[in-house]
């Protein structure tokens, strides 16, 4: 962000990776991302079958909930047809990415970089174009989950709900927009729940719907820094017990950039040990 000739703030979109930091750091609250709340409500009013695809980070975003069933009840009270935890897509992502790693590293690539964050992916490809081939092309858990649900219910629409505004960028991409119809941040979801006067704590929970889905702990761990790499490494270890996969992780775009600089300079050892 810089000032133009009149002193007005401008965003340099050639450098923007949609990380959302400007939203939280602007002292005047003058920057906002493009919301889809109106379009979602219109879908509810039309009677569209809309699934809520909830990122596993909801556990930390809504710590006051006694159970996942409370969140599911709240989302259904808003008008969602059903609720699916995106961690199940993370499990599919783990398997697919583990296969890719075994196929590519070290035979074709000296390391593989991965993250489900579209802001990270854009930063990496923009700042390190020569490392684009090292970035995993596996679909994100959001896309895996949305496609899985659309295969099961082709007429339904999908709304991803997560912590980060960058997912709106991912959902707008040509290859994804037919899979994910809406994106809400947890902040937007909390605002809708409050506007509808839904008392989440006192909602009745259907005994058969206490849990969302039976995703693995590794899939839910995608929300943590280094969680994706750990899940993939553990899956490879499960298939090849004698293989040692080195992991280097970072938190935040600044640390990620430093890590990629080290990888580019071959100062990180991330290749697996030779396979038998």
Predicted regions and their residues:
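Iron-sulfur-cluster electron-transfer modules
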Residues: 1-152
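Glycine-rich beta-alpha junction loops
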Residues: 56, 117, 162-168, 187-190
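Short beta-strand/loop segments at the ligand-binding rim of alpha/beta enzyme cores
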Residues: 155-158
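Internal gly/pro-rich beta-alpha loop/helix module
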Residues: 169-176, 182
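Glycine-rich phosphate-binding loop plus the immediately following alpha-helix
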Residues: 182-203, 225-226
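A conserved mid-domain beta-alpha-beta active-site/ligand-binding segment of alpha/beta enzyme cores
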Residues: 202-234
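Acidic/aromatic/glycine-rich contiguous surface patches that form carbohydrate-binding/processing clefts
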Residues: 246-259
């Amino acid at each position: 962000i810089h000032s133009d000739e009149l002193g007005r703030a401008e965003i340099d979109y050639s450098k923007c990776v949609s990380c959302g930091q400007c939203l939280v750091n602007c002292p005047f609250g003058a920057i906002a991302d493009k919301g889809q709340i109106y379009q979602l409500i219109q879908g509810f009013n039309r009677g569209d079958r809309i699934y809520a695809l909830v990122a596993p980070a909801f556990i930390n975003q809504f710590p006051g909930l006694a159970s996942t069933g409370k969140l599911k009840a709240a989302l259904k009270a808003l008008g969602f047809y059903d609720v699916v935890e995106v961690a199940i897509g993370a499990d599919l992502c783990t398997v697919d990415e583990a296969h890719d790693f075994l196929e590519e590293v070290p035979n074709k690539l000296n390391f593989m970089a991965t993250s489900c964050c579209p802001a990270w992916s854009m930063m990496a490809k923009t700042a390190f174009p020569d490392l684009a081939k090292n970035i995993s092309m596996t679909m994100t858990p959001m896309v895996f989950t949305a496609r899985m649900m659309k295969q099961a219910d082709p007429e339904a629409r999908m709304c991803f709900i997560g912590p980060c505004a960058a997912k709106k960028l991912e959902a707008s991409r040509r290859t994804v927009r037919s899979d994910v119809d809406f994106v809400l941040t947890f902040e937007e979801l909390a605002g809708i729940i409050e506007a509808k006067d839904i008392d989440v704590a006192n909602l009745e929970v259907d005994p058969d719907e206490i849990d969302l889905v039976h995703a693995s702990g590794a899939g839910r761990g995608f929300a943590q820094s280094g969680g994706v790499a750990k899940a993939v490494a553990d899956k490879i270890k499960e298939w090849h017990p004698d293989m040692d996969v080195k992991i280097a992780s970072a938190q935040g775009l600044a640390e990620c950039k430093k890590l990629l600089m080290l990888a580019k300079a071959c100062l990180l050892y991330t290749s697996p040990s030779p396979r038998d």
